[in-house]
Structures are given as structure tokens and as C-alpha cells.
Design a protein with these regions (language model features):
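A detector of single, family-specific signature residues
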Residues: 1-407
Length: 407
């Protein structure tokens, strides 16, 4: 068996090959891309003709290079960069660092400590596609939120009437009116009929007349005014920001359609959607982040640990503390937090479990985290046994005093 450390960069890879005893067999720098992968395979073939006898350590689990390594049949371990940095300090504390040295470090790590790390999951291409779409969809939502916050901040500087007229600046009503009247002077010229026409063109069908009157009253109310030149400049930036948010709304809707199509064709989609609080979009996010490799999570605890919902115990001497995990998959944790919130409004068992934790003194987010932790365990059981969610089975034995789940 041979062990290879791969210290990757954007344009090249430094690799170090060693045997079971830690003896160096080869080391070199390979270019990124097809020629580099060919060189990698040539080095491997010289020392280990069987791909099963090749163990690789690398500080990423994504990209075409990693895909090529796993497709070749090598055992690939994605090691957290923080773990690599701590491992470096284990051998020397001088602070010295080099790409070639890090490659050797990674090879040593998977040679001696790979039992403490997980190999890259063997997820299907279908779930990888779902993850890409779900992350892209979420990225666009985060981008829209940033632009909406910037718009709100700008309107506070010169156009407070717009903030009084619209609670949600990313809503179609707000975008339609602000696109036509990006300054208070423009707003003063808007008649009720023009506002009504803009709302109708944006897609509103109900309460057109009453809503148009409300908007006109808010926009024409007396307010502090900026200098005309400043207001005009702000108006130009508002018009541009409104156009960006409107386009983001269209792209988010298109990605939702694409994501729903991919999710609904996945073999596990019915199981995910059977759980309370998981719809198409949220279910797709959770599925994409967990993956569909049936061997990745051997127990419910390992799935909970990866999700970051299970408590973390810190004990030393007579001291013992149970804390929340902060090193976690942020996207997955956020999705489970939303899932738990939705579940307590749809599942009597989840609601009762939440109420138990609140009654025991937990804060809202602590109780919500406990519900999310329990839901992850339920999901694991459903996937393991290939069965849909059942309310009675899931919660009948949990109507007791909460434990450290909410830490």
C-alpha cells in the first residue's frame, strides 16, 4: 500500500508518495488539469498497480481533480485544513511551511491517522447535481438579501416614504413602484391610476385600488428631503439596485424550478418529503448536503455530528460542560434550523418535544436545535429502513423529560 499527500493550488499539485514505513518513494509537482492527472496516474502505476492500494490525503472534497482521483478507484480522504495545521504543530512548532512539506504531512497523516478521518463519500451524480443547484439557489437568495439591505440603507438616506410604503423591498410591488419612481419627486407625480397599473403589470390581482391608495399616501406624506442633486444621485443607484433585485427574483424562480425537477426524480425524495416541515426546496438542500452514500453515516449519531445538531461535551478533571457545536456545515445546519421551525408547526410530536425543552428552561434556539437533532435521527432511521415518516413511531417514546440534546 502507498500513501500520497496532495497539496493543491489553483495551478499545480505538489505530491509526496511514501510506503507503509514512511519511506519516500517519489515527490514532484504536477500541473492542474488533464496532463497533471496523467502524470499522477503514471507515478501511482510505478509503485502500486492496484488502485485499492492507494490512499490519498488532500485538503478539499470538490473539483474535477478530486473527481478524477475517486473515479480511478483510489481511497481519497478530504482532510480539514485546520486539522492539517494542528497536525503540522504536532511535529514541529517553528512555523516553517512549504507546499512540498505539506504534501509530505498529508501523506503521513493518512498513513498513520486515517482511521480518524472519513474518506470522500461515494455520492451519486444525481445528488451532486442537487447540491450544486441547491447551493446556487441559496447563494442567489443571499445575494438578493445583500442588495435588498443596501437598498433599504440608501432609502433611509433620502426616501423614507418608500420604507413606509413597503415592508418587503424585494417584493414585486416595491420593485414595480421604485422602478418607476426612484426619488420622492418622481413619487409625487404618480397618480393612483399609474400606481394601480404598475401593480397590475407586476402581477398583483387583489386589492389593487386600496393598495394603490395606501402607497400613494405613504409616498406623498411629509418627510425630510435631501438636496435635489443628492436625491437624483441616490435615485440613479436605486434604479440600478431595483433592476438587479428584479433580475435576481427571476433567476431564483428559474433555479427553484430546476432544483425541484432534480429533487423529485431522486430515489430518496419521497422519504425526505414525508418528514414534517420538509418541502421541495428545503428537502433538496438537506439531501444535497447529506448526500446519498448509504455507507457514509454508519449511525444516527454520526449523521447528527456532521449536521452540527448534536451536543459537544467538554470534560476535564472535575469540570464538565455540554455545548453546541460551532464547527459544522453551515448550509446544512441552517437548513435543519429552518426544518425544525417548520416541523413544530406541522408535527404534534415535534411541537411537544419543543415545548418540553422550553419548559425545562431552554431558550428558543436551544429547543429548536434539540428538535432538529431529533429530526436528523428520525431521517437516518427512515433512510436506513427505506420507510416513510410515521408520526406515532417517531415520537411515541419521546414524551419524556428532555436531556442534553438542547445544549
Amino acid at each position: 500500500m502507498i500513501f500520497i499527500g496532495d497539496d493543491w493550488a489553483e495551478a499545480h499539485h505538489d505530491i509526496h508518495v511514501m510506503d507503509d514505513n514512511g519511506t519516500r518513494l517519489a515527490s514532484r509537482r504536477l500541473p492542474e488539469g488533464l496532463s497533471g492527472i496523467r502524470g499522477f496516474h503514471d507515478v501511482v502505476a510505478t509503485h502500486a498497480p492496484d488502485p485499492d492500494q492507494v490512499v490519498i490525503g488532500i485538503e478539499t472534497d470538490r473539483g474535477l481533480w478530486v473527481d478524477a482521483l475517486t473515479a480511478a478507484g483510489y481511497q481519497v480522504y478530504a482532510v480539514n485544513p485546520l486539522a492539517v495545521a494542528r497536525y503540522r504543530d504536532r511535529h514541529h512548532v517553528s512555523g516553517a511551511k512549504s507546499d512540498a512539506g505539506d504534501a509530505k504531512l498529508l501523506a503521513d497523516l493518512v498513513r498513520t491517522d486515517r482511521h480518524n478521518h472519513r474518506p470522500i463519500a461515494g455520492d451519486s451524480s444525481a445528488v451532486e447535481a442537487i447540491k450544486v443547484l441547491a447551493r446556487g439557489h441559496q447563494n442567489l437568495i443571499w445575494t438578493r438579501n445583500r442588495h435588498t439591505n443596501a437598498l433599504r440603507s440608501a432609502l433611509r438616506e433620502y426616501y423614507p416614504g418608500a420604507l413606509a410604503a413597503f415592508d418587503d423591498l424585494a417584493d414585486r410591488d416595491a420593485l414595480a413602484i421604485l422602478g418607476r419612481a426612484p426619488t420622492p419627486i418622481d413619487a409625487a407625480r404618480l397618480s393612483v391610476s399609474k400606481i394601480r397599473s404598475a401593480l397590475k403589470a407586476a402581477g398583483r390581482q387583489r386589492n389593487l385600488d386600496s393598495r394603490a391608495l395606501e402607497i400613494q399616501a405613504a409616498l406623498r406624506a411629509e418627510q425630510l428631503a435631501a438636496a435635489p442633486a443628492v436625491a437624483a444621485a441616490f435615485g440613479a443607484t436605486t434604479r440600478a439596485t431595483v433592476a438587479i433585485i428584479a433580475e435576481l427574483n427571476h433567476q431564483i424562480a428559474d433555479l427553484e424550478t430546476e432544483l425541484a425537477t432534480h429533487f423529485e426524480t431522486h430515489p430518496d425524495a419521497d422519504i425526505y418529503r414525508s418528514l414534517p416541515g420538509l418541502g421541495v426546496i428545503l428537502g433538496a438542500r438537506v439531501l444535497g448536503e447529506f448526500g446519498d452514500d448509504p455507507n457514509r453515516y454508519t449511525t444516527a449519531k454520526s449523521r447528527k455530528n456532521y449536521a452540527g445538531t448534536s451536543p459537544l461535551t467538554v470534560a476535564s478533571g472535575k469540570k464538565r460542560a455540554v455545548l453546541a457545536r460551532h464547527v459544522r456545515n453551515r448550509r446544512l445546519y441552517d437548513a435543519i434550523d429552518q426544518w425544525a421551525f417548520c416541523a413544530i408547526t406541522r408535527s404534534p410530536g415535534a411541537r411537544a418535544y419543543y415545548d418540553q425543552h422550553r419548559a425545562a428552561g431552554d431558550l428558543h434556539h436551544q429547543a429548536l436545535r434539540a428538535v432538529g437533532n431529533r429530526l436528523v435521527g428520525i431521517l437516518h432511521g427512515c433512510l436506513r429502513h427505506h420507510t416513510a415518516y410515521d408520526e406515532q413511531t417517531a415520537w411515541s417514546h419521546r414524551q419524556n423529560t428532555p436531556t442534553a440534546d438542547a445544549a
